[in-house]
């Protein structure tokens, strides 16, 4: 079957929609009348003929069919007239056939715009067949009727403001257009004459001067100017209903291509920006529900969207928290650091910059092809590094060589070495502002000022190795809590100042207190364990200790008393965490289990009874609220993030649990099944180390991302990371090193040698394409 041809003018033959129809009449206006008159008289025509049907008129449809068929004659533009029937007389009005509309007059003599095809009106039109035009035209302008002489040759009339509604003058054409000749260009002169090109000096005043400009042969009018004036005249003098009718006629006579262009233009400009049309608070709330990928895309949608997003403090705060770059409780601290780092930026800009930096770095962490910049620094004299702290851009390590070494994580260099202990350093805790506390096998606790590079206080009192320590703060007082192999915990107040003047006598410091009685910072001793205290954790006034006697004890350091004894493990306890937000205690043991204890409501645990110790009555709880199983060997390591509780064991496995309900979330195994010696976790990343293995996991996808970054290390002793920087204490070829990995930079590895007894560092940089070559230490 053949396809139907598409109409060239799709809207021409459709009925006028109801909302665009008009009824009744309108009073004649000078400017509109001038436009109608000019439209009729401006067309060049040598003759005019009345074509009539049996009733003396020709149907417009027949005329259009003839024009479409074509007669082979050259038909120049002509004046077309519509015959309007009245009871008493017939009046001819100029019309424009190209707009398929005409001016009609009702019984009151008022002009009315109607649709010719709908009203079955008849036309009196000029034809170019050489017949004579009527000698007289009766033109009805308003109520009055005027007779206009129509000679065989007619010149365009010059119409003044007073002539529009009262009379129409005719003139003689001196140079009539020859039949078949092309129409004159708007800028061309009449034959035999020369007309200089000059801009018109006439001023259009919304009356028949518009027609005067149209008819003018000696002036050049800007098309835009003329269009604006015509539109203004129509818009100011036509009622809205008639104006809509006229617009529809204009659109109806556009061809398919023009309609398509117009439709696209209308569609594009009718689009509505929902976000900017809403109140700012509601728009912001909508953005708060978007993920960061959508937020980044929204920044490029429009300037308004970009402004809303960029200037919103709450939005960037929400993104930082929701993407796990900062915890809700840590936001204020982050905001303070950012204000110090970017003092000239607004809060919104600081938060936005921080978020974008974190996103960029996280993508590098998650990219298995990304190789971070690696810097290797000389470690301790022994191969084993026992403890590591990474705070305030300080990386601090302790070892059995009795030394504490401090590195700068920003500049990736060794800073200084702290000496003073007479035994191995097994416990470290960074306080604030460069203050460090250490515990040693020499049974002492030392307080250090890193900025001044010296020890400020020495606390004595333990009878055996200080194996663990923590710092808690309660009512603006910071307490040092230490656990020892002598089965006790000691509590000291942390000195508020280093007490070392800038130019003091060095031999007077550190301040050494040989006995607790003479120590003004000593608070007391906590007794209750029957074996070595292996782990301690606390917050505020609550401290939890775990011992080789298989029990945990919950202490109140403000009152220096025991609160609860937690029994349930069947073997030594190696790690414990006090979850102060949920008021729970978490412990890991050699019995391969992890146990959860509810300290807010002790009746949620096992059987509860009361026991007494040397100080005060103490509740004894037999059995935990939850017991987590899955490991098959000693569980020696625990860490808690906002989302996950993570445990690591000697069976080479790492398991993740939901921090709220303790459901299983993930499980990883090192390929060599060697004991996990260290790991560190955030809500986005997990890093673990063991013998000959160092892994980085994407906790969002659950996939192993990196496994070969430190493949030249024989043993990973300790790891920690924050932001773009990961630090790892490792052993290679019987020596210890500190590795610094920068995930904001790629592919460059620095191998650095530091003289052990010097705070200055000699640097040697070697770059490799993959960063996997073994370290060569420069002597």
Swiss-Prot record:
First and last residues of every WD repeat: 380-408, 420-449, 461-493, 528-556, 568-598, 630-658, 669-698
One Gene Ontology cellular component: 90S preribosome
Molecular function in Gene Ontology: phosphoserine residue binding; U3 snoRNA binding; ubiquitin binding
Pathway connected to this protein: Protein modification; protein ubiquitination
Motif Nuclear localization signal: where in chain: 82-85
Summary of the function given for this chain in its UniProt record: Substrate recognition component of a SCF (SKP1-CUL1-F-box protein) E3 ubiquitin-protein ligase complex which mediates the ubiquitination and subsequent proteasomal degradation of target proteins. Recognizes and binds to phosphorylated target proteins. Directs ubiquitination of the phosphorylated CDK inhibitor SIC1. Involved in the degradation of CDC6 together with CDC34/UBC3 and CDC53, and in restricting the degradation of FAR1 to the nucleus. Is essential for initiation of DNA replication and separation of the spindle pole bodies to form the poles of the mitotic spindle.
Outcome of substituting residue 82 to A: Prevents nuclear localization
CDD domains in the cross-refs: F-box_ScCDC4-like, WD40
Keyword Signal attributed: no
GO biological process, any: G2/M transition of mitotic cell cycle
Subunit structure: Interacts with DCD53 and SKP1. Component of the SCF(CDC4) complex containing CDC53, SKP1, RBX1 and CDC4. CDC34. Interacts with CDC6 and CIC1. Interacts with SIC1; the interaction involves a SIC1 double phosphorylated motif (degron). Homodimerizes; the dimerization increases SIC1 ubiquitination in vitro.
Location of the F-box domain: 272-319
Name of the protein: Cell division control protein 4
Subcellular location: Nucleus
Taxonomic source organism: Saccharomyces cerevisiae (strain ATCC 204508 / S288c)
Entries under Gene3D superfamilies matching the protein: 1.20.1280.50, YVTN repeat-like/Quinoprotein amine dehydrogenase
TM stretches of this protein: none
Region annotation (Disordered) ranges: 39-80
Keywords assigned: Cell cycle, Cell division, Mitosis, Nucleus, Phosphoprotein, Repeat, Sporulation, Ubl conjugation pathway, WD repeat
Record note on what altering residue 83 to A does: Prevents nuclear localization
Organism superkingdom: Eukaryota
Residue numbers carrying Phosphoserine: 104
Gene: CDC4
């Amino acid at each position: 079957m053949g396809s139907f041809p598409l109409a060239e003018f799709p809207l021409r033959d459709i009925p006028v929609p109801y909302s665009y129809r008009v009824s009744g009449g309108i009073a004649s206006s000078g400017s509109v009348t001038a436009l109608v008159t000019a439209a009729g008289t401006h067309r060049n025509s040598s003759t005019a003929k009345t074509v009539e049907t049996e009733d003396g008129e020709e149907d417009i449809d027949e005329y259009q069919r003839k024009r479409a068929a074509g007669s082979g004659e050259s038909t120049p533009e002509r004046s077309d007239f519509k015959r309007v029937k009245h009871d008493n007389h017939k009046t001819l009005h100029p019309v424009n056939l190209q707009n398929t509309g005409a001016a009609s007059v009702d019984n009151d003599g008022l002009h009315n715009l109607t649709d010719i095809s709908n009203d079955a009106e008849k036309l009196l039109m000029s034809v170019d067949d050489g017949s004579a035009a009527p000698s007289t035209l009766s033109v009805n302008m308003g109520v009055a009727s005027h007779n206009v002489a129509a000679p065989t040759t007619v010149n365009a009339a010059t119409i003044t403001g007073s002539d529009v509604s009262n009379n129409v003058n005719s003139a003689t054409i001196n140079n009539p257009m020859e039949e078949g000749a092309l129409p004159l260009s708007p800028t061309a002169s009449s034959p035999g004459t020369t007309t200089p090109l000059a801009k018109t000096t006439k001023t259009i005043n919304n009356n028949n001067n518009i027609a005067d400009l149209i008819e003018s042969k000696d002036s050049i009018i800007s098309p835009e100017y003329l269009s604006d004036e015509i539109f203004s005249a129509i818009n100011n003098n036509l009622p809205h209903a008639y104006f809509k009718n006229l617009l529809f006629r204009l659109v109806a006579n556009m061809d398919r291509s023009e309609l398509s262009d117009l439709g696209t233009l209308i569609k594009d400009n009718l689009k509505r920006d929902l976000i900017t049309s809403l109140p700012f608070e509601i728009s912001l709330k909508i953005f708060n529900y978007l993920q960061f990928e959508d937020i980044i895309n929204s920044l490029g949608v429009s300037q308004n969207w970009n402004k809303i997003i960029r200037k919103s403090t709450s939005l960037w705060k929400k993104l930082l928290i929701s993407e796990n770059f900062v915890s809700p409780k840590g936001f204020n601290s982050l905001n303070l650091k950012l204000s110090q780092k970017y003092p000239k930026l607004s809060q919104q800009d600081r938060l936005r910059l921080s978020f974008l930096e974190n996103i960029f770095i996280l993508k590098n962490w998650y990219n298995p092809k990304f190789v971070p910049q690696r810097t290797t620094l000389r470690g301790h004299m022994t191969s084993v590094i026992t403890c590591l702290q990474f705070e305030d851009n300080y990386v601090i390590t302790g070892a059995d060589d009795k030394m504490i070494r401090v590195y700068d994580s920003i500049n990736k260099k060794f800073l200084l070495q702290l000496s003073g202990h007479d035994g191995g350093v097994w416990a470290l805790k960074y306080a604030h502002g460069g203050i460090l506390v250490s515990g040693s096998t020499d049974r002492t606790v030392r307080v250090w000022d890193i900025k001044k590079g010296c020890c400020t206080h020495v606390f004595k009192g333990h009878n055996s190795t200080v194996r663990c320590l923590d710092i808690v703060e309660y009512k603006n007082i910071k307490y040092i809590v230490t656990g020892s192999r002598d089965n006790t915990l000691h509590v000291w107040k942390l000195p508020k100042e280093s007490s070392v003047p800038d130019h003091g006598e060095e031999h007077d410091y550190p301040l050494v207190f040989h006995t607790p009685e003479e120590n003004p910072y000593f608070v007391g001793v906590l007794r209750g364990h029957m074996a070595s205290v292996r782990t301690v954790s606390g917050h505020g006034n609550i401290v939890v200790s775990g011992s080789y006697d298989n029990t945990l004890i919950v202490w109140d350091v403000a009152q220096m008393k025991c609160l609860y004894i937690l029994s349930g493990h069947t073997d030594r306890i190696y790690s414990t965490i006090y979850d102060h937000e949920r008021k729970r205690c978490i412990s890991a043991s050699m019995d391969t289990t992890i146990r959860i204890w509810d300290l807010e409501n002790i009746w949620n645990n096992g059987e509860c009874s009361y026991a007494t110790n040397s100080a005060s009555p103490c509740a004894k709880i037999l059995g935990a609220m939850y017991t987590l199983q899955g490991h098959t060997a000693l569980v020696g390591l625990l860490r808690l993030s906002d989302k996950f509780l993570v445990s690591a064991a000697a069976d080479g496995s790492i398991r993740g649990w939901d921090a709220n309900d303790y459901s299983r979330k993930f499980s990883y195994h090192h390929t060599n099944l060697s004991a996990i010696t260290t790991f560190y976790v955030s809500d986005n990343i997990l890093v673990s180390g063991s013998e000959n293995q160092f892994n980085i996991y994407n906790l969002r996808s659950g996939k192993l991302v990196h496994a070969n970054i430190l493949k030249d290390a024989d043993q990973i002793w300790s790891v920690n990371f924050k932001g773009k920087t990961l630090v790892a204490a490792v052993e290679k070829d019987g020596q210890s090193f500190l590795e610094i990995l920068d995930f904001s930079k790629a592919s460059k590895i620095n191998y650095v040698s530091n003289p052990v007894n010097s705070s200055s560092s000699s640097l040697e940089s070697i770059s490799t394409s993959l960063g996997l070559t073994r370290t060569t230490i420069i002597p």
